[in-house]
């Protein structure tokens, strides 16, 4: 528990099982670009870890790798990550927003269970599997953006105990009925939007910005840090992440 910061040498290629489990004093973490995998329970219970940026070499995050990192507020996943293991970020209730890169194909069971501070979630169309209870207990969610033209099959427990009456589910244009008739239909507010920019953000040509909103739907006068939703004069809506 006395370890507060950690910088690993470039010779390290993987973080083994439970290597830093229980290092409750660890607040900052720098991983070298040589690391390709973070194994199960690697940072389990590192309750003081605040921000986490993984190098672009990491492809997999093991089961319970960051479970119980209750101070984790900022999470940046690189476009190399393809798999998020079971309970990988379970109980990280300080995590506020999450945009998964378009490389992710699998989200394990209970991966983000109990992340009650999570307000905004963006799921790319690359995801082909979401495990049971993956987002159970994410009671703070106010917006979810998906871009599957055909709803991905999910278990009834996937969003259990989320505020499905308040949270807005944004789906691609022309897919409202399909989502409403699937397990995604638990969300009372389903809104269609232009999902073309959800995986690859592009500029909107000659179109001009006409309005901007925060992830919770609040109108913004100027760009704000985090996820911004921008409406353009040609009718398109784009997701923009402001650093």
Predicted segment positions?
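A structural signal for leucine-rich repeat
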Residues: 157-162, 182
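Consensus positions within tandem repeat domains that build extended binding/scaffold surfaces
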Residues: 16-21, 39-44, 62-67, 85-90, ...
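A recurrent domain-boundary module in secreted/ectodomain proteins
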Residues: 180-197
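Generic structural signal for well-ordered beta-strand positions
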Residues: 220-221, 238
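Structural signature of tandem-repeat unit edges
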Residues: 1-14, 24-37, 47-60, 70-83, ...
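Residue-level detector of functionally pivotal "anchor" positions at catalytic/ligand-binding pockets or at interdomain
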Residues: 193-212, 216
């Amino acid at each position: 528990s006395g370890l507060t910061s950690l910088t690993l040498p470039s010779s390290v290629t993987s973080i083994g099982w439970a290597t830093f489990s229980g290092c409750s004093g660890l607040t900052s973490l720098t991983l070298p670009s040589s690391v390709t995998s973070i194994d199960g329970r690697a940072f389990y219970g590192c309750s003081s870890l605040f921000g986490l940026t993984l190098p672009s070499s990491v492809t997999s995050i093991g089961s319970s790798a960051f479970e119980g990192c209750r101070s984790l507020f900022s999470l940046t996943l690189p476009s190399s990550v393809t798999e998020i293991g079971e309970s990988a970020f379970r109980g990280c209730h300080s995590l506020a927003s999450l945009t998964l890169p378009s490389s992710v194909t699998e989200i394990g069971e209970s991966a983000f269970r109990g992340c009650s501070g999570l307000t905004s979630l963006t799921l790319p169309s690359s995801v082909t599997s979401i495990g049971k209870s993956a987002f159970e207990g994410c009671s703070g969610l106010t917006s979810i953006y998906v871009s599957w033209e055909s709803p991905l099959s999910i278990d009834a427990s996937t969003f259990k105990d989320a505020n499905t009456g308040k949270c807005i589910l944004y789906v691609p244009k022309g897919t409202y009925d399909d989502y409403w008739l699937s397990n995604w239909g638990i969300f009372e507010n389903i809104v269609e939007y232009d999902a073309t920019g959800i995986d690859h953000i592009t500029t909107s040509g000659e179109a001009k910005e006409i309005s901007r909103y925060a992830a919770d739907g609040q109108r913004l006068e100027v760009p704000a840090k985090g996820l911004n939703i921008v409406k353009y004069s040609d009718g398109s809506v784009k997701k923009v992440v402001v650093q």
